[in-house]
Amino acid sequence: MASTPAEYIQHHLQNLTYGKLPAGYERADGSILDQATWTIAQTGAEARDMGFMAVHLDTLGWSLLMGAIFILLFRSAAKAATAGVPGKLQNLVEMCVEFVEGVVKDTFHGRNPLIAPLALTIFVWVFLMNSLKWIPVDYIPGIAHLLGLPAFKIVPTADPNGTFGLSLGVFILILFYSFKVKGFGGFTKELAFTPFNHWSLVPFNLFLEILGLLTKPLSLALRLFGNMYAGEVVFILIALLPFYVQWTLNVPWAIFHILVIPLQAFIFMVLTVVYLSSAHEDHGHAELTP
């Protein structure tokens, strides 16, 4: 697939990037663009030069595919649901629903019928995206290489753009429910007078609370990305070893990842529910300390 280990690693860890290169740009093959062109990046340098508007086609495609699989599975189970002896798919879906419902009841202290479906969607979707790591590391990138694609990653959660997209959605929901439940004045007051209930400490409180608010999506995104990306790198490094050594290291690492993949989906879901629960709580404040 690649002539050197560096090319092999680059092919597996670089995303399939589509974006716009400016006129006069010299490409990796030595050709010079006569005009600004939307194209697929051939190297990491080209991907960087495409700038902010570049799109990771592999991350986007696999995310949508896993989302579609989630919808089809749960829709099929719902349509085939019966009061009699349930089938295997119905059993699996009911287990997921009951598990997530129990987590939400224990964690979420407000009243919102949308939180449990949201938590279920996040848990199953992230789990499905993580589970792509169970596919042997060379299979799909190898097919992509035969098709002439310069790079290809199949795990959306090993791409920071994917995890930050998820966490940004959660962050928007946190702000939405904070303003909806507490009102603009109530939410602003909470930021200004927590943790110290004194007018002279409002700037310090705002700094702490806004910083804490911004770290929520950062922690969600970086935790998921860090665990998935690190696992991806280890699998790729193991694949570079001689065949007789690969089994010695790959089997225990794969077994370990059987636990990591659902665990990271669970952590992302629980933290999302915790943050949304906090957004629904109107803490209130006593009279200002003079």
Swiss-Prot record:
One annotated Gene Ontology cellular component of this protein: proton-transporting ATP synthase complex
Main location (coarse class): membrane
Function of the protein: Key component of the proton channel; it plays a direct role in the translocation of protons across the membrane.
Family to which this protein belongs: Belongs to the ATPase A chain family.
Subcellular localization(s) per the UniProt record: Cell inner membrane
CDD domains for this protein: ATP-synt_Fo_a_6
Transmembrane segments: 54-74, 115-135, 136-156, 164-184, 201-221, 233-253, 254-274
Summary of subunit composition and partner proteins: F-type ATPases have 2 components, CF(1) - the catalytic core - and CF(0) - the membrane proton channel. CF(1) has five subunits: alpha(3), beta(3), gamma(1), delta(1), epsilon(1). CF(0) has three main subunits: a(1), b(2) and c(9-12). The alpha and beta chains form an alternating ring which encloses part of the gamma chain. CF(1) is attached to CF(0) by a central stalk formed by the gamma and epsilon chains, while a peripheral stalk is formed by the delta and b chains.
PANTHER family, per database record: ATP SYNTHASE SUBUNIT A, CHLOROPLASTIC
Keywords: ATP synthesis, Cell inner membrane, Cell membrane, CF(0), Hydrogen ion transport, Ion transport, Membrane, Transmembrane, Transmembrane helix, Transport
GO molecular function terms listed in the Swiss-Prot or TrEMBL record: proton-transporting ATP synthase activity, rotational mechanism
Protein name as it appears in the record: ATP synthase subunit a
GO biological process: proton motive force-driven plasma membrane ATP synthesis
Origin organism lineage: Bacteria, Pseudomonadati, Pseudomonadota, Gammaproteobacteria, Pseudomonadales
Pfam families, A to Z: ATP-synt_A
Annotated source species: Stutzerimonas stutzeri (strain A1501) (Pseudomonas stutzeri)
Bilayer disposition of the protein: Multi-pass membrane protein
InterPro entries hit by this protein: ATP_syn_F0_a_bact/chloroplast, ATP_synth_F0_asu, ATP_synth_F0_asu_AS, F0_ATP_A_sf
